[in-house]
């Protein structure tokens, strides 16, 4: 009887703890990957400015990159 109660309580508890740990680990890995490999590159930012008919300064490009990396933190 005690073994059944222990199994009945420990299995769902382990599943819940595992779900929380998995969630936080996956979020940490995802954020680290987004910092290392942002969804947009400096060349893409320059081409966006070129499509608008503007020539961006290096400061504008760096500002846009900082905005994207700040967003992923």
Curated annotation (Swiss-Prot):
Transmembrane segments annotated in the record for this chain: 5-25
Cross-referenced Pfam families: UPF0154
Membrane topology classification: Single-pass membrane protein
Predominant location: membrane
Record InterPro entries: UPF0154 (IPR005359)
HAMAP family in UniProt: UPF0154
Family per similarity comment: Belongs to the UPF0154 family.
Subcellular location: Membrane
Domain of life from the UniProt record: Bacteria
Keywords on record: Membrane, Transmembrane, Transmembrane helix
Any one annotated GO CC term: membrane
Identification of the protein by name: UPF0154 protein MYCGA5700
């Amino acid at each position: 009887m005690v073994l059944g109660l222990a199994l009945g309580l420990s299995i769902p508890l382990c599943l819940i703890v595992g779900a929380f740990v998995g969630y936080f680990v996956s979020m940490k890995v995802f954020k680290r990957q987004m910092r290392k490999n942002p969804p947009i590159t400096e060349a893409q930012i320059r081409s966006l400015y070129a499509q608008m008919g503007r020539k961006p300064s290096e400061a504008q490009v760096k500002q846009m990159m900082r905005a994207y990396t700040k967003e992923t933190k």
